[in-house]
From Swiss-Prot:
Keyword Ligase: no
MF terms in GO: rRNA binding; structural constituent of ribosome; tRNA binding
Function: One of the primary rRNA binding proteins, it binds directly to 16S rRNA where it nucleates assembly of the head domain of the 30S subunit. Is located at the subunit interface close to the decoding center, probably blocks exit of the E-site tRNA.
Family affiliation: Belongs to the universal ribosomal protein uS7 family.
Gene Ontology biological-process annotations: translation
GO cellular component: small ribosomal subunit
Keyword presence, RNA-binding: yes
Covalent S-S links between cysteines: none
Name of this protein: Small ribosomal subunit protein uS7
Superkingdom, taxonomy of origin: Bacteria
Gene designation: rpsG
Pfam families named among the record's database cross-references: Ribosomal_S7 (PF00177)
Length: 156
């Protein structure tokens, strides 16, 4: 284990087009095989599509979508006396943001539209309206935490 303590958190650099750090985080989540130019093209085209379909600012819509996907609670496994309990815990803001981006991109990839740009556009629009698979994942996570509320005293 390192003796110096945890590495400091580096600030997220805002993207050059929208000037929003959340967009550059989304680009990095879409990124595959180091092809950042392609990832940026996908995200920027998707955000342009969101602005065209929605008539509102794309970054505002993206933030609204992430607010609808961001979880407040999750369950963590905790072993107590030979049995494993699913213990509900509050999600820290940084992890909640990371999970929201991960779920948004994962469920965008699994959609049926032809191009990744269309998939991401429609998933962002669905999430901003409270629909879509990413929002359902958040609801399932909250439901799981609610049903295991009896084990909340095992929190650490």
């Amino acid at each position: 284990m390192p003796r110096k303590g945890p590495a400091p958190k580096r600030p997220v650099v805002a993207d050059p087009v929208y000037g929003a750090p959340i967009v550059s985080q989304l680009v990095n989540k879409i990124l595959l095989d180091g092809k950042k130019g392609l990832a940026e093209k996908i995200v920027y085209d998707a955000l342009a599509g969101v602005a065209a379909k929605n008539g509102q600012d794309a970054v505002v819509t993206l933030k609204k979508a992430l607010d609808n996907v961001r979880p407040a609670l999750e369950v963590r496994s905790r072993r107590v006396g030979g049995s494993t309990y699913q213990v509900p815990i509050e999600v820290k803001p940084h992890r909640a943001n990371t999970l929201a981006l991960r779920w948004l991109t994962t469920y965008a990839k699994s959609r049926r539209e032809k191009t990744m740009t269309e998939r991401l556009t429609n998933e962002i629009l669905d999430a901003s309206n409270g629909l879509g698979a990413a929002v359902k994942r958040r609801e399932d996570t909250h439901k799981m935490a609610e049903s295991n509320k009896a084990f909340a005293h095992y929190r650490w």
